[in-house]
């Protein structure tokens, strides 16, 4: 059981051999993961046992959903970068300023990206310094003017046969040109070369379906 950005949201992962822990995990989330007195639980729509447990604790399903999609990496992963754009890895060019600007703009923040020493150091760590980070797998698409246009981060442990796509963004000035597609598929090509046969992304956006991802599993927020 964990949360992503802070207490208030709870996600569950349990080994099939230890599903008897689920009631205790739910109770722990309800007691210890609240924020301002509130907590919501992400429950897989396929997990009837967990649904029954959270329902018995007085929670009810909402219309808030969380989709996931899957891609077969044994199939060809074809893309073409837009004319004048280059596809690189963060091992080739670790421009923290450009990376910071892209993620700021790509995820819809207004104005200029903050460039305090603390912000840039955090970006540097998120580019190459995190546990499990493989800079050669994390792909940026560079525009003709040298600015980062799109980015795809992926996570792959060579002891496993799957990859996780996260995060992905494109600068608003470079959308609808194939930059995001190029970043994602190049990153996944590299994962496939390391032995990954499947890729997952926590999204059900048409952007992913257009490159071959298919709906895999959905979850619902319970409160």
Which ranges hold each PLM region?
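Conserved active-site tyrosine of GNAT-family acetyltransferases
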Residues: 52-55, 208-209, 213
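A conserved beta-strand-loop-helix scaffold within acyl/acetyltransferase catalytic domains
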Residues: 2-7, 110-169
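Short amphipathic alpha-helix that is part of the acyltransferase structural core
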Residues: 80-117, 145
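Conserved acetyl-CoA-binding loop-helix of GNAT-fold acetyltransferases
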Residues: 19-31, 170-172, 176-193, 210
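Acyl-donor-binding surface of acyltransferase catalytic domains
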Residues: 5-85, 89-91, 221-223
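Conserved hydrophobic beta-strand within the GNAT/NAT acetyltransferase core sheet
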Residues: 39-42, 165, 198-203
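A structural microfeature
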Residues: 1-2, 62-65, 150, 180, ...
